[in-house]
Amino acid sequence: MEPKKYLLFVTLPYAYSILRPLEREIRRRGDSAAWFIEADCPVALEEGEVHLKTLREAVDYNPVAVFAPGNYIPDFFPGVKVALFHGYAIQKRIETIDDHFTVRGWFDIYCTQGPSSTPYFKELERQYGFFRVYETGWPKADTYFSPETQLKPRNERPVILYPPTFTRNVCSAPHLMKEIELLAKTKPWDWIITFHPKLTDPDIIAGYKRIAAENDNVIFFEGPDKMPLLQRADAMLCDSSSIILEFMFLDKPVVTFRNSHPGPHLIDVDRPEKVGPALERALSRPEELMREIRAYTMHHEPHRDCRCSARVLDAVDDYIARGHAGLKRKPLNLIRKWKLRRHMHYYPLLEMFRR
């Protein structure tokens, strides 16, 4: 049988760590994977990974499926369109329904993660009727629950990771800059500060880079792979970001600043001066807090067998085997499709005339 071809679609740097476990499973099965990376996203491929640099190359590659951890996927790419999500449904803002559950008409398959997402998407599947939902677990979870990732850090001094979200009105970075600088100077802790690629405020970035430059115990990390940071840290300071949950997968505590949905799994504070005492409590790993963390993470991601990527590929096989039986037609989405073509400069008819 001829090897299957799969396309991995990247719009932002966080996609690499989500898609690489899937790529490993594809290769393990004897099939092939290639990457298409949007023009404004940094290329961070590893040796041996295949990079399709043009839209024409991606279309001609003719994959059986395309995987996207973002909100959209080019409809003109061949193959089954698979949504993998860029995180978990944690509700960053105060809202009735998280935008995690927004259906935009791009995807054929939604690969859900667990009880926090599957029931909602099953209801949307019934409501819309043009896609199928499979609970597979998140491919990135294969990395989190591997034995090597679960190893506890051995730091001489406690390490605090600070990865604030970019979301307006939720981001803690403007409010905590002075307090973090004070704690860096007065507490026996090491700090790692890293920002989401969408957090682009130049004053905020410059302020935290200055703190790192002036304090030997502070690192400002810039790069797409946050996993080594999560592994190294003993505790996290954050606000309302899905990276909180990912850190908790490693059985580690989190202090949040004005979290939009606080609960017993978090140590949430509402004033900057409370951050230091909260971090001290987190570093002591109270038994009740750690028990709540384990229950919370299981609600979001019960799949701990490192086979989420395998289930994603099995879902694609099942979708193809069943065909479109019982499915409605996708919406035309003409305006969205036109905007996407304009954004990606995809005009195949013009290409034909130019030949």
Regions found by a protein language model. Give the residues of each.
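Donor nucleotide-activated moiety binding/catalytic core segment of transferases
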Residues: K53-D60, D201-M248
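Conserved catalytic-core segment of nucleotide-activated headgroup transferases in glycan assembly
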Residues: A15-R27, P139-K209, R304, C308-A310
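Catalytic donor nucleotide-activated moiety binding site of glycosyltransferases and closely related
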Residues: S32-P42, E46, K187-E222
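Active-site regions of enzymes building and remodeling cell-envelope glycoconjugates
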Residues: L45-R56, P78-H86, R210-I219, K252, ...
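C-terminal amphipathic helix plus adjacent low-complexity
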Residues: L283-R355
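Catalytic binding pocket for nucleotide-activated donors in carbohydrate/polymer assembly enzymes
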Residues: R104, G129-F130, R210, S242-R304
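A donor-sugar binding/catalytic signature common to diverse glycosyltransferases
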Residues: N71-Y72, F77-F85, G223-L266
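Active-site and donor-binding regions of nucleotide-sugar-utilizing enzymes
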Residues: L7-P147
